[in-house]
Amino acid sequence: MGNSTSLFQRLVNTFIIAMQEPNKLTKETMLKIAIDKQYVNVVEYLIRKRVNIVNCRNSYNPLISAIETENEEIVNLLILNGASVNELSHTNNTPLHVAVDKNIKP
């Protein structure tokens, strides 16, 4: 029984690490896909599993992606869980710049 628990823990840990890795073809992380598809429950799950929500690989900024989808619930989830509102994108824009560019009103 102890062996199966250990195996289970290793599988879970491997899965958590894999969640951070971008897809080899699309270069997108699970978080990026969930944000783009606006799967709030998946974003919540990934946050609970402590995936990186600040700045991911390939200069991808999850908060900026959420702002671009105009999904206020995901934007709030990310901010409440530590996403930086000052983190720059690969084009040197902050999330506020992106919101203004999209003409998003408070």
UniProtKB/Swiss-Prot annotation:
Keywords recorded for this protein, A-Z: ANK repeat, Repeat
Repeat (ANK) residue spans along the chain: 26-55, 58-87
Superkingdom of this protein's organism: Viruses
Keyword Amino-acid biosynthesis belongs to the record: no
InterPro entries: Ankyrin_rpt, Ankyrin_rpt-contain_sf
UniProt cross-references to SUPFAM superfamilies, sorted A to Z: Ankyrin repeat (SSF48403)
Transmembrane parts of this sequence: none
Classification via Gene3D superfamilies: Ankyrin repeat-containing domain (1.25.40.20)
Name of the protein described by the UniProt record: Putative ankyrin repeat protein FPV241
Lineage of producing organism: Viruses, Varidnaviria, Bamfordvirae, Nucleocytoviricota, Pokkesviricetes
